[in-house]
């Protein structure tokens, strides 16, 4: 449910307008002028709210909902209570999101936290930096020498943009973010607390001189339409660049090592760790807490199950999971086999009488 203290209240919409906008079918045409003033989940919705249903796990919430209208697929249409206006849709959640995007367009990218429309008095902008028109710089942000920032971009409070960094148009850099040695395209959304372009973890280990640091002289290249979640860190390359491909969406607290190349339209969930010199193809999806070893190649369209550890190359369109990761069919067979062994093993297996004289180490 939208909280007016934080988000703008959208204007009322009629069910006819909602149906026209989403391509949904309003089953009871007599309710076409019924007004909707907000969006909410099934369990929190009231008579003026629009909701959706697309998962049978929430059937009890659907039966008890007080919502005024609900997007629902034909399969579940008969389960909708009589007081709820039915908006039939083949993709209920997608239709709901369409309306949510229209009603709350301002939430799709961070805005100035201070309702600022220009360069704040307390911001520090080096004289050699070039900011195009309509760039917003919030209080206490620092823009270094030679920086270039395109029109419509917003730099959050306390962000630090290092020397020579280039940021394209209509970008958002969240509060407390640091960016160095990086070139960033257009329409890039960087959430608060990210760190981009710092040294990669490059050392010659355990030599006679100790751990010898390897110079990191590459860059970070972030292409257009990338989104980077809060607290994510992206190391610059050592010799070649670290690259994030166009349209890729990265969740919070992801670590991307030096020289990593991520293709276009990839999805990376939270707390992933990518070791250095790894290559990921286009349209790859990685679940939360996946770890991938260095110098591997993950093929186009591959998917990796959450909490997997990857030590081998994955072919295009591979579906892998486990620790260590392997094709999911093989992984599932092994899991079921171990489960059968545990279930069907000797009744007393593992229950030997302890030696009373054994006091441990």
From Swiss-Prot:
Can you state which reaction this protein catalyses? a UDP-3-O-[(3R)-3-hydroxyacyl]-alpha-D-glucosamine + a (3R)-hydroxyacyl-[ACP] = a UDP-2-N,3-O-bis[(3R)-3-hydroxyacyl]-alpha-D-glucosamine + holo-[ACP] + H(+)
Q: Does the keyword Acyltransferase apply?
A: yes
Please report which protein family the annotation says this sequence is part of.
Belongs to the transferase hexapeptide repeat family. LpxD subfamily.
Check the record and name the PROSITE patterns matching this protein.
Answer: HEXAPEP_TRANSFERASES
User: Is Endoplasmic reticulum included in the keywords of this UniProt record?
Assistant: no
Subunit-structure text:
Homotrimer.
Q: Which gene encodes it?
A: lpxD
Under the cellular component aspect of Gene Ontology, which terms does the record hold?
A: membrane
**Which Gene3D superfamilies would you find in this protein's record?**
Hexapeptide repeat proteins (2.160.10.10), MurE/MurF, N-terminal domain (3.40.1390.10)
Give the GO terms filed under biological process for this record.
Answer: lipid A biosynthetic process
Which HAMAP family does this chain map to? LpxD
Name of the protein in question: UDP-3-O-acylglucosamine N-acyltransferase
The species is Nitrobacter hamburgensis (strain DSM 10229 / NCIMB 13809 / X14)
Q: Which residues form the active site?
A: 258 (proton acceptor)
Keywords for this entry? Acyltransferase, Lipid A biosynthesis, Lipid biosynthesis, Lipid metabolism, Repeat, Transferase
- InterPro entries referenced in this protein's UniProt entry, alphabetically: Hexapep (IPR001451), LpxD (IPR007691), Trimer_LpxA-like_sf (IPR011004), UDP_GlcNAc_AcTrfase_non-rep (IPR020573)
* Pathway in which the depicted protein is active: Bacterial outer membrane biogenesis; LPS lipid A biosynthesis
């Amino acid at each position: 449910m939208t909280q007016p203290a934080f988000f703008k209240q959208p204007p009322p919409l009629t069910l006819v307008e909602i149906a026209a906008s989403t391509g949904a079918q309003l089953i009871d045409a007599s309710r076409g002028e019924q007004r909707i003033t907000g969006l909410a989940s099934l369990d929190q919705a009231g008579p003026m709210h629009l909701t959706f249903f697309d998962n049978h796990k929430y059937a009890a919430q659907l039966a008890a909902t007080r919502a005024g209208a609900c997007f629902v697929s034909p399969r579940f249409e008969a389960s909708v209570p009589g007081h709820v206006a039915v908006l039939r849709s083949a993709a209920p959640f997608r239709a709901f999101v369409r309306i949510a995007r229209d009603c709350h367009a301002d939430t799709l990218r961070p805005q100035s936290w201070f309702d600022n429309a220009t360069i704040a008095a307390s911001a520090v902008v080096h004289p050699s930096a070039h900011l195009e028109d309509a760039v917003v710089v919030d209080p206490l942000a620092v823009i270094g020498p030679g920086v270039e920032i395109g029109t419509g971009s917003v730099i959050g409070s306390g962000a630090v943009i290092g020397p020579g960094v280039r940021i394209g148009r209509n970008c958002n850099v969240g509060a407390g973010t640091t960016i160095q040695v990086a070139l960033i395209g257009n329409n890039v959304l960087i959430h608060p607390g990210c760190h981009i372009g710092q040294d990669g973890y490059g050392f010659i280990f355990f030599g006679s001189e100790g751990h010898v640091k390897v110079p990191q002289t590459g860059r970070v290249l972030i292409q257009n339409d990338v989104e980077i979640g809060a607290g994510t860190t992206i190391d610059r390359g050592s010799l070649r660049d670290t690259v994030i491909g166009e349209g890729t969406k990265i969740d919070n607290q992801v670590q991307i090592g030096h020289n990593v190349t991520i293709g276009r339209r990839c999805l990376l969930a939270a707390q992933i760790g990518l070791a250095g010199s790894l290559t990921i193809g286009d349209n790859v999806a990685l679940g939360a807490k996946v770890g991938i070893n260095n110098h591997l190649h993950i093929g186009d369209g591959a998917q990796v199950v959450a909490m997997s550890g990857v030590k081998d190359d994955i072919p295009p369109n591979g579906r892998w999971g486990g620790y260590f990761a392997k094709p999911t069919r093989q992984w599932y067979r092994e899991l079921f086999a171990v489960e059968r062994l545990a279930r069907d093993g000797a009744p007393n297996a593992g229950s030997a009488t302890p030696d009373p004289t054994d006091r441990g180490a």
